[in-house]
A protein has these predicted regions:
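Flexible, glycine/threonine-enriched loop-and-boundary segments that flank and lead into catalytic domains
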Residues: 214-234, 335-337
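Hydrophobic alpha-helical segments characteristic of transmembrane helices
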Residues: 109-112, 118, 136-139, 311-328
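Extended, charged coiled-coil "arm/hinge" scaffolds of SMC/Rad50-like chromosome-maintenance ATPases
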Residues: 264-302
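Cytosolic, long alpha-helical scaffolding segments
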Residues: 172-179, 242-258, 263, 267
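Charged catalytic and DNA/RNA-contacting regions of genome-maintenance
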Residues: 1-97, 106, 110-113, 117-126, ...
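Conserved NTPase motor "head" modules and their coupling/switch loops across ABC/AAA+ ATPases, GTPases
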Residues: 253, 316-350
Length: 350
């Protein structure tokens, strides 16, 4: 409690924002088996004593988790072995349900395999540094949630009780699904983030760009027909934008409103006032699109941020389910039997 009090004073003093801060869970020594550092090493719980990596450790034997957060929780369980018999028996019963129900176990394995690291994505959302691809990973993960919930409710096992605690994330899923492009990039200020139809203003700006491109094509055809320069063509590069290129053999047909910008060995490059007008229309639309898409993305991310507690709860439940699943796999593969526990200090092996 003294440490928590100091932490609270630090937060208040420096005005630290704790958007993703979870509730304080008190660690009671009476709840967990205390294992000293030397014993942890000698037992090779997480690393072997030969190469000092996970291979050959207890963790390597029991780890069949499908998600990063499930793996982290399984690690925590090794650090904090339970002492309370009722809690141990609850885990045992859940593991047993999966061992005895192969259909449930197999379907759960597939669904867990489609879930990304919700816990880490949630943290990035909280600190405002998640990108659009993170949201797509989140959306794809959330698509498995109602399936897991339905699977548990139909299972007639202890997992049906867990299903009732799985939060509703349909709103978050629908928000991302309706707004963020599926093949989105990582960078937020290069556009290509938001779907057509999500925002009316953005659609208008995009349409202006399309109109500009159509005008550009028509203008090229018109100038070719008017000047009689059969090989007149529009060229684009990032430094100078759009320009007309005319080969040396047609220089006598170049009209007065063509302003020379660059001389090449076999051709010259020109600008016109009309070309500049159309170019500004296209480039202006492109910059407006990027700015608007970024603005919309930040708004979407902030909306999801308001539901961060829901995502935290979901992450905790998925990690718990995944850890139980992992134990059920190792129990099934190795044909483990379920031990009966007592508080009398008796070990009876038959």
């Amino acid at each position: 409690l003294f440490s928590i009090d100091n932490f609270y004073k630090y937060v208040c003093r420096f005005n630290v924002k704790l958007n993703d801060f979870k509730k304080v869970n008190l660690y009671k020594l009476s709840d967990y088996l205390r294992i000293d550092a030397n014993s942890r090493i000698n037992l090779e719980l997480k690393k072997n004593n030969f190469s000092n990596d996970i291979n050959g450790s207890l963790l390597s034997v029991i780890n069949y988790t499908k998600t990063p957060m499930g793996f982290r929780l399984l690690n925590k369980w090794l650090d904090q072995p339970l002492l309370e018999i009722e809690k141990i028996q609850r885990r045992q019963s859940l593991v047993e349900d999966l061992v005895l129900n192969s259909n449930l176990r197999n379907e759960l394995e597939e669904l867990l395999g489609s879930i990304s690291d919700i816990e880490r994505i949630n943290s990035k959302i909280s600190f405002g540094n998640c990108n659009a691809r993170d949201l797509i990973h989140l959306k794809n993960s959330l698509s498995a949630v109602p399936k897991i919930k339905r699977l548990f409710l139909d299972s007639n096992t202890l997992f049906s009780n867990i299903a009732s605690n799985i939060p509703d994330t349909e709103y978050i899923y629908n928000l991302i699904d309706s707004s963020i492009l599926e093949d989105v990039g990582i960078l937020l200020k290069e556009g290509n983030l938001i779907k057509i139809g999500y925002d009316e203003e953005l659609d208008v700006i995009r349409n202006n760009k399309i109109v500009g491109k159509e005008k550009l094509i028509k203008y090229e055809v018109d100038e070719r027909n008017t000047t009689g320069i059969k090989n007149l063509r529009l060229i684009f590069n990032k430094k100078t934008g759009y320009f007309f290129e005319v080969t040396k053999s047609y220089q006598n047909l170049v009209p007065e409103h063509f302003e020379l910008k660059q001389t090449l060995t076999n051709a010259n490059r020109y600008k016109t006032n009309e070309l500049l007008t159309i170019e500004n229309m296209i480039f202006g639309s492109e910059s407006d699109i990027i700015e608007k898409e970024y603005e919309l993305f930040i708004s979407i991310r902030n909306t999801i941020k308001m539901n961060i507690k829901t995502l935290q709860k979901l992450s905790d439940i998925i990690s718990f389910i995944d850890s139980i699943f992992s134990l059920s796999i190792v129990a099934f593969k190795n044909n483990y039997c379920k031990p009966t526990l007592n508080s009398e200090g008796i070990i009876d092996i038959k």
